[in-house]
UniProtKB/Swiss-Prot annotation:
Matches recorded under Pfam families: LIM
In-chain residues carrying the UniProt-annotated modification N-acetylmethionine: 1
Organism: Homo sapiens (Human)
Ranges that cross the membrane: none
Binding site for Zn(2+) 1: 40, 43, 61, 64
Name listed for the protein in its UniProt record: LIM domain-containing protein 2
Superkingdom of source: Eukaryota
Amino acid sequence: MFQAAGAAQATPSHDAKGGGSSTVQRSKSFSLRAQVKETCAACQKTVYPMERLVADKLIFHNSCFCCKHCHTKLSLGSYAALHGEFYCKPHFQQLFKSKGNYDEGFGRKQHKELWAHKEVDPGTKTA
């Protein structure tokens, strides 16, 4: 059924009755790579090669690659990603415009709050 990539090898074999030798033809066996099972980042099920899609180094089923907001099926040319979440371009723009920045528009704490002024010790001088 399958043929090996290499030529057949001749291997000597001893005849059980007379101790004579004969030649047995064996084909080189081809190695089957152990395939790593890849799982979909959205549904955590096995992804087979025909349904595999990679976006931002994450693996998805074609059908699982959807907008987080409206669940529309996305393609590699029609998505925008932020913080590991995927959006269709219209919703990405709509959510971004609603607050005017990435953090608030997508329900996160504003980055500037992380840099809020801390209380300064009254004994220290500031320039």
